[in-house]
């Protein structure tokens, strides 16, 4: 479900693109931006 999806950690990987995305930071209690790519 959507709730369990929001509990996943941010994962760093390799890519040539740079796309702004957001994830829910459970420690901060809010969405935070990261660069996907």
UniProtKB/Swiss-Prot annotation:
Protein location: Secreted; Nematocyst
GO molecular-function terms, A-Z: potassium channel regulator activity; serine-type endopeptidase inhibitor activity; toxin activity
Gene Ontology terms: cellular component: extracellular region; nematocyst
Family annotation (PROSITE patterns): BPTI_KUNITZ_2
Key words of the record: Disulfide bond, Ion channel impairing toxin, Nematocyst, Potassium channel impairing toxin, Protease inhibitor, Secreted, Serine protease inhibitor, Toxin
Secreted is among the record's keywords: yes
InterPro entries noted in UniProt: Kunitz_BPTI, Kunitz_BPTI_sf
SMART domains according to UniProt: KU
Keyword Secreted (UniProt): yes
Every BPTI/Kunitz inhibitor domain range: 6-37
Function: Dual-function toxin that inhibits both the serine protease trypsin and voltage-gated potassium channels (Kv).
Family note: Belongs to the venom Kunitz-type family. Sea anemone type 2 potassium channel toxin subfamily.
Protein name: Kunitz-type proteinase inhibitor AEPI-IV
């Amino acid at each position: 479900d959507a709730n369990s999806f929001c509990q996943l950690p941010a994962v760093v990987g390799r890519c040539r693109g740079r796309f702004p995305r957001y994830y829910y930071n459970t420690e901060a209690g809010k969405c935070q931006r990261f660069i996907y790519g």
